[in-house]
Amino acid sequence: MNKSHKIKKPIKVKFVFCLLIGFLIGNSFTNLLLQDDRGEIHITIVYSSEKASWMTTAYTDFIDTWNDAHPDEKISIDMHPYGSSDSMIGILNEEISPTIWSPASSIWLPFLNTKWKDLTNNAELIINLSAAVKIIYSPIVIATWEAFNDTHNIKGFSDLHKLNLDSGINIKMAHTDPRLSNSGFMSVIMALSAASGTPSENLTMNDLTDKTNQKWLKEFESSAIMYGKSTGFLARYMKSEGPDKLNIAFLYENLIRDISSSSNGGKVIAIYPEEGTLYSDHPFCILNADWVSPEQRKVAEAFLDFLKEPTTVETALQYGFRPIDPSIPLDPEVFNYEKNGIAYNLNIPELKTPNDVNVLLKISDLWLLSKAS
């Protein structure tokens, strides 16, 4: 008994000693990891999905540039493509907390500011509109098949409306759900402007409630076969399914470049509405939110400065985007009607966002009254 007891005691002491050493080593290692994690500056960028290819390229190039210039400052960036409306709702619901928010269009910025103020009762706006960085844009266009347009000579919204009234023409149209996606939202604004004959920036609530306008829109929407969540999906659907399934879609110009020459059933072309078009100007906004630290803002500002570099902008042009800076020339091999179905010059009016925020808030309600069942 005594012998056995004497043997167990040093084992117990050794065990406790080893446990203590293990704890100290493990705790030190954990602290080292935590210190390393605290030393890394992490930002999150939420952006509209149609610019994913460009953003992926820009992200890779920026990380390389940052590491070369700041070898002792570690950063990490999470990149998340979202629908513009979806991301706005996610911010308001605190589901996402981006450092940089880049919806497809500036049309969403006053939206978020208004809803943020109502939700938080905070006098400070979450977006400083004057500080939004705009680098590229893409107009909303009417996508159709070249052969289809050779027959029907579509020039804009009014022509499409007339075709919808002709029972002998089988129009199969699509745009995205304006409650979820920027392109559908902007398309409904453009259609209302055409219906009322009112410049889009001057649209009022009277234009939305006008029975004649509502009738026109109902006729216009009558040929819709789907309302997608993603503009990119509509482009891919048009490309893969051909003109028998979808012969009219409202897309971004840059997506026409992606699908024009490789689509089943012929060539897809962009029609630039004679009434004018809204531009998706892809603003980049560093949010004024409590989750954005000064260190994160510093990295975010560096990223936006990098995006503004001419070489970075020129990369975006290869994906079919146009530069905000007029001194940066277009590539005629990209903006080439014969090759990619898109024009080099834009010879149509640029429409503006409605000045009345209430109009913006009610556009989706108007669509719900008018949409095809």
What are these regions (language model features)?
Residues N2-F17, R38, A289-S373:
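Extracellular/periplasmic juxtamembrane helices and adjacent flexible linkers that interface
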